[in-house]
Regions:
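Surface-exposed helix-capping loop/turn segments at secondary-structure junctions
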Residues: 87-96, 138-143
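Hydrophobic/aromatic-lined pockets within catalytic cores
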Residues: 34-38, 65, 90, 106-107, ...
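Extended, well-ordered alpha-helical scaffold segments
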Residues: 73-81, 121-135
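Acidic/histidine-enriched, glycine/proline-rich intrinsically disordered or flexible terminal extensions
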Residues: 146-163
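GST superfamily/GST-like fold recognition
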Residues: 95-119, 127, 133
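GST-like domain detector, emphasizing the conserved glutathione-binding G-site
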Residues: 1-93
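Short, flexible loop/turn segments with low-complexity composition
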Residues: 40-42, 140-150
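Structural helix-adjacent loops and short alpha-helical linkers that scaffold large soluble proteins
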Residues: 39, 117-122
Length: 163
């Protein structure tokens, strides 16, 4: 209810600042919270993620929400991005934490839509990077389940050890 008051579009992410400013775009929220500027390479991959990969990911996961969309065709088109990312990881296995944080949620969504198919694809570097992120303590802390918060509940502080 409160989210709809501050952001009528009704989608996440939404960040409400103390001064009343509302930020509704993932990248803008990351830049605000982390106060970081993107390198040229980070901007390249995040732009491709936002403009290319996510476009096809949405149509792959939810083909019934779009007209004349073939799920397998969308999977193939999204895969082109992962093939390029795999080649990038083959030449330089580490990527910045900021870039990893920006790309990981979307690659995870893509992988989880058909995990059996995803796991047998030739992008071994992407798979290793994804597995490393899935097994990280940071991811496990982020994915801890909480009951839905309602006004009046005790504030949940993240991470829990920072309270």
């Amino acid at each position: 209810e409160h989210m709809m008051e501050i952001s009528p579009k009704g989608t996440v992410p939404v960040l409400l600042l103390e001064d009343g400013t509302v930020i509704e775009e993932s990248l803008e929220i990351m830049q605000h919270v982390l106060d970081w500027m993107l390198s040229e390479e980070e901007q390249h991959w995040i732009s491709r993620n936002d403009d290319e990969f996510k476009f096809h990911l949405d149509r792959y996961k939810y083909p019934n929400r779009y007209e004349d969309v073939d799920e397998i065709e969308q999977r193939t088109l999204a895969s082109a991005y992962l093939i390029d990312l795999d080649q990038r990881l083959a030449t330089e296995p580490s990527i910045s934490e900021a870039l990893s944080d920006a790309l990981f949620p979307f690659v995870r969504q893509f992988a989880n839509h058909d995990r059996d198919w995803f796991d047998v694809q030739p992008w071994t570097n992407v798979l290793a990077w994804l597995t490393e992120n899935l097994e990280s303590e940071a991811f496990k802390a982020c994915m801890k389940k909480h009951k839905q918060w309602v006004k009046g509940d005790v504030t949940i502080v993240f991470p829990a050890d920072s309270a």
